[in-house]
Structure formats: structure tokens, C-alpha cells
């Protein structure tokens, strides 16, 4: 079973590390090509392209400039400990045991605009390059054209290595769009998280993102290997709703706190 999650815009390169083990990203040659393209952008162009403030654009221009192909624990950090958005608040990888990291390294993948596919312990230098950004490059007009089948092929390698054919899609639509489902050698299962608001159940972005992290943690902590085991997920008040679910979609609901 292979879990897919999105990266985060918020990064943490200050907190103490809970493991010293690391691996290197497998698609660094591709990342280097994107850095070459990104370095051509001025801060105002970055601001416009990413729809971010001038201050953030300056920070990210500096990150592109400072990026170097030789990754060490001094200039990079394990991806699962560097990302700090809503998904990672639910995941809480900073509390993982070494055995948890082992299982995650085999069963969890982060899709990345810059790095393509990251394993949890892959070192990562700081960046911001969302998959949906229209960064023109030698392979096309955006990052989807740049990555082509590369991400899908890398996921197929991971599935083959574990002798499995199930993908748990906990990534956002923006990131999963970089995967080619017809070329993926797997059954795709998508957990959906609905929260009650004013008597109606719907997707509330902040809660749904955190729930994707909670589900990832649930799978890792309990060493789950079969999709039917996901129905036992009950973190922070969520419960499985079989009536609303289908073969490819597992629906989890949570009542409004009153």
C-alpha cells in the first residue's frame, strides 16, 4: 500500500531533528533542471507567477539562487520533518519512532513540484514551487508537462518494490493531477473527509487537510497494509460512513462539536 500526500508551503528548518537518518531524492537531475529555469525569474515575476507578496518572492528567489545539487544534513533536512502545513500537523512525524520512519519510508510518498517524488527521509533544500504553477520549461508550458510520466513511473517502482498494487490518494487534486491513473499499476482509493456544519456534511479545507495527515499517521502507526483496514480510522471524532462510500472512495464524517 502506497500513501500519497501533498507537500506544504510552510517549512521548518529550525526544530530539533528526531532522526539523523536520511536518504537522497531520486529525481535530483530533474529538480536541477527546474532550478535552472526558476533562476531566470526576477522577484516581481515570481510574485506574479506564484501570487505571493514581494517579501515572499524575495525569499524564494534567494532559495532558488542558494539551491545546490550536493545535499547534506547541513544544507538540507528530511522532507517529512521539513514540511509543516495542515497535513503535517495531523501527521506529527516529529513524534515518530525509528520503526515508524522505516514503515513510512516504504509506504509514504510526497508529490513535489520541484522534486517530483519524495520519500520521508529524503533530504530537501527549502523551496516553493507548487505543482499548478505555469513555469515554462524545456518540456512544456507547466510542471505537469515537465514531469510527464516520470512521477507515475517512480510510484510504479515503489509499488513493485513492496509487491503491492494499492495507492491511497491523500494528495490534493493539484498534486494528484501529476499522476497518470491509467499508467499507474494500482487500484486507487481516495479517502474523503466531511465535517458537519449547520447540519450538513461537507469538505472544509483546513479540517480535510489535517485529516489526510491523521489518516497517514493511522496507517503508519498501525502498520496497515490492506485498504479495508482504513475503515477503522476514528482519529479526532471521524467515523467511516459505509453508505456514502464506494469502491474507490472511502467517506469519513465528523459531527460538529456542540
From Swiss-Prot:
GO annotation, biological process: response to hydroperoxide
CC annotations in GO: cytosol
Pfam families xrefs: H2O2_YaaD
PANTHER family: PEROXIDE STRESS RESISTANCE PROTEIN YAAA (PTHR30283:SF4), PEROXIDE STRESS RESPONSE PROTEIN YAAA (PTHR30283)
Similarity annotation: Belongs to the UPF0246 family.
Protein name: UPF0246 protein YaaA
Gene: yaaA
